[in-house]
Regions:
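Active-site and donor-binding regions of nucleotide-sugar-utilizing enzymes
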Residues: 1-14, 52-153, 158
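Conserved nucleotide-sugar phosphate-binding/catalytic loop shared by glycosyltransferases and other
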Residues: 15-62, 72
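Donor-nucleotide binding loops and adjacent catalytic segments primarily
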Residues: 39, 175-268
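Short acidic-hydrophobic, aromatic-tinged amphipathic segments that line or gate anion-handling sites
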Residues: 47-51, 137, 157-159, 252-256, ...
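A donor-sugar binding/catalytic signature common to diverse glycosyltransferases
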Residues: 87-88, 95, 99, 110-111, ...
Length: 315
């Protein structure tokens, strides 16, 4: 399960707060790793499952999938009637959950509010912020932005990025690394790039070209590449199909990993490349270089280990 879920669970147990856990989207899909099983293994009880993702993975199916989520989520809230809805990040289903919650007059707490990014997720994050009642920012830049956007100061708390707390848990990382090496490859004995390239909704027509340029560049310059599957946004099927056509014996694709197994991958890599927020937020904890490509994380708050490339242009 994700770090945010772990920390939230520890808090509500301590405070003896009852909560309802709903999982959706790729957590329930076999072709995206079926991470629901990881949530259960970590000891969480899943109260509701919201199936939403239509096949096709284009702009139309993505929009319809969000509409399906909205219908199901409103039924869930009507049945449970919680005192609060806790949302994290900037995903489309998170945005839909904020809209439904607000219109059903249920207060919203938003984790990692106020950050910038360059694609539709960034727009969703700020839209969620306008529906939310409590804003948990991950840095002072985001906290100040929330205030400039008109949110009341007493509602804003700068709590830091929750992902970073796990970076110092060396024992769990080492145990997870041993599990990962049994399943895939002995990462401690090879040099590799950690590659994560998600589709960009606004650049759907260029997905194949952009991904192919990146993959071919890495094949030429990096001996071993470990890839994490893209998310389910429109264009994800194009990336997966392109990977299968371009891959060779030095490419490894992993659909889903438990949290600490992923951290062990990040800790041992030579560098991380692509357009994932993990490179922006987490890689500096291990002093790993991050090559951030394109608009998806554009203007995201980052430190000196991140190199931003505006446009993929390789001959």
């Amino acid at each position: 399960s994700g770090v945010i879920l772990d920390q939230y669970w520890n808090y509500v147990k301590k405070k003896k707060i009852k909560f309802n856990l709903a999982v959706s989207n790729t957590h329930l899909l076999n072709n995206f790793g079926y991470s629901k099983s990881d949530i259960i293994k970590d000891g969480f009880k899943i109260d509701d499952e919201i199936f939403m993702t239509l096949d096709g993975y284009n702009d139309v199916t993505m929009a319809k999938s969000l509409a399906i989520f909205g219908q199901s989520f409103s039924d869930l809230l009507n049945r449970v009637r919680p005192d609060w809805v806790v949302l994290a990040g900037d995903r489309g289903e998170t945005f839909m959950a904020s809209v439904i919650s607000a219109y059903m007059n249920i207060p919203i707490a938003h984790i990692q509010a106020g950050e910038l990014s360059g694609n539709i997720d960034g727009q969703a994050r700020h839209a969620i912020g306008k529906f939310a009642h409590l804003h948990f920012a991950s840095n002072i830049d985001a906290a100040k932005r929330l205030e400039k956007l008109g949110e009341q100061k007493f509602r804003i708390q700068n709590l830091g990025a929750p992902q970073l707390d796990d970076m110092q848990n060396t024992q769990k990382i080492l145990i997870a690394q041993k599990k990962l090496e049994k399943k895939f490859v002995e990462i401690s004995k090879i040099n590799y790039a950690l590659c994560i390239f998600h589709p960009v909704v606004e650049e759907y027509q260029r997905t194949k070209k952009n991904y192919s340029i990146l993959h071919n560049f890495l094949k030429k310059h990096v001996k071993f590449r470990i890839w994490i599957s893209p998310n389910s946004d429109s264009g994800s099927n194009i990336i997966k199909d392109s990977f299968n056509k371009l891959r060779d014996s030095n490419d490894l694709l992993i659909d889903n990993l438990p949290r600490f197994e992923y951290i062990s991958l990040l800790k041992n890599c030579d560098f991380i490349i692509g357009n994932s927020s993990s490179g922006i937020i987490e890689s500096a904890s291990f002093k790993k270089p991050c090559i951030n490509i394109g608009r998806r994380q554009k203007n995201r708050f980052s430190v000196r280990n991140v190199v931003n490339i505006e446009v993929i242009n390789y001959r």
